[in-house]
Structures are given as structure tokens and as C-alpha cells.
Amino acid sequence: MTLQEEITRRRTFAVIAHPDAGKTTLTEKLLLFGGAIHVAGAVKSNKIKKGATSDFMEIERQRGISVATSVMGFEYQGRKINILDTPGHEDFAEDTYRTLTAVDSVIIVIDGAKGVESQTRKLMDVCRMRQTPVIVFVNKLDRPCKDPFDLLDEIEKELRIRVRPLSFPISSGDTFKGVYNIYEKNLTLFTSDERQTADASTVEINDLASPELDEYITERYANQLREDTELVEGVYDAFDREAYLRAELAPVFFGSAVNNFGVKELLECFIRIAPSPRPAPTETRIVEPAEAKMTGFVFKIHANMDPNHRDRIAFLKICSGTFERNKNYPVSYTHLRAHET
């Protein structure tokens, strides 16, 4: 595989959110659907005994929050996916801000009941400043939530970005039925609650006008879905990928990460529209990813954070070229040599 082919197939993104919006749970389910794990853990749950994969530190498992960025990767449909799960709490925001310098796109998780919260606004300001493309995932639709159209208006106003829903929920709370995939023009209904494996049975309906839809979700919810999707198509412009890549438009997905609702739809669309590694600006020039010379920067260092971890681990964002094991690289400003240990 050539360097350009390797660059094109990579997708590196961060999952960011206000505390308790479901960021780490979504990360866990993306790993599940991507085949990186076979059973999804949970941040806080009495039913699920397995802890979240990204919460590897003991303090994270004890408190049920993320306090440090975790980096995970998997192969999916020919793409190399790198996920960075970030802390949501303001006390650890510096970690998240540094992580945002190393990603090519972002998924913002929003609690459907609470809407846009303070930390989400601050993180979006950083994304806007860096012109980082964002996708919004409205989470926790299995609980009573705000009206979807009210949420879309709130996202546009509070995050100051145009939105375009690419999926739409069928009710919420106790009557939540699933999500309609506007991007793929089909409906997937999940028939299980809180399944932590990726083998939940589904029903796909490609035509909303089909009477079969009434049989699955009743005539009331079927008619409501038809009206909602018609309104979406009438109010919002067609999805423009170039506008998304310019960070001018945010695709919006709805779902419930803990119940697997809407996660696969998000992942399938993400690998199609998200950017591959982008050029990196420096003080003197723009570094293109396809340049032969290896360049990069350390965006995070773990040191003495967990007794089971190595004493120091540096996280390197490669901006161009290929990193080779057991090879020394000059470190800018310090004139030191860096090598993999």
C-alpha cells in the first residue's frame, strides 16, 4: 500500500461532550460495532460488570468519569479508525484541548434531555477556531427528551453552526422505537434493550410509505415519522459534504448509545464523509500528509498516572511521512533525539 493510499483510508477523530452526556459510552459502542471488542463495557452501571475500555485508570473506574484522553483504533470496511475519548469534566479540560490539536474531525455528544451545555460550548469554540469538522450525536433518546426540532434549533444557536439531520428519532423515552436513517433512506428498528453485544436483531424498511411500517411501530408513530422527515427535507438544505469539511455544517444523528440505537448509522456515515489526515499548519509553512519526510508533534504525555502503566508514554500525532521503529528523529527546538521505546 502506498503512502497516499494509507493516508486516504485513515480517520482520526475525538469524541467530546459535557460531563455525563454519554461520550465514553458512545466510544465503547463504536468499538463494539467496529469489531474491536466483543462485549461493550459501561462507565456506570449495576447491570454491566465490564468497565469501559477507554477508562483504563483505576481512578476512572472508581469515579465513573474519564480524567485522561484514551486512544483506540480498529479496522472497519477498509478504513483505519483512530478514536480519542476525551475527559468531559472542566477540571481536565486542558487534556481535551490538547487532544483537539491532533484530530482531523470531532463527534460532539449532546444529552437529548439537557441540550447544549456549558462545556460543549467551550469545546465547540476550539473546534471553530481550528476549523475542525464536527458531527453531532444527540444521545439518550431512550429517556424523555426535548423535541428533536427544538434541539436542532438549539444546536444551531448555541454552537453557531448550521445543522443537517442525517437521522431522526421515532419518539423518545419509554416509547422510543429507533431511528430513521435519512442519509441511507432506510429505517432500522432494534428489538432489544441494553444489549451490550452487536448482534441485536434489526428490521429494515426502505420505504416510509409502506404499510409494513405501521405494523412495526403503530400507525400513530409511523405517521409522525412521515411528517417529521417531510419537514426535515423541506426546512433543511441537502447535505453538503464540502460544507461539512469546511466546518460550516454539522450533520446530526440521534440515538441511544447504551441501547445501540443509532450508533451503527453514525459509524457507517462517518467513515464515508469524515476527512482523512489534513495538512498541518506550522509557523513557516503547511506540511502536507503525503510528504516523504516524517514530521509530527507530541500532543500528550502520560507520566505516573497508573501503577499498571509505563512511567512515561508520549502520544505523537504524525503529520507527514512514516514513523519507523528504532529510528532516531530530531526534536525541534531542543536538538535532542527521539526514538520509540
Can you name each region flagged by the protein language model?
Residues 1-337:
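Structural and coupling elements of P-loop NTPases
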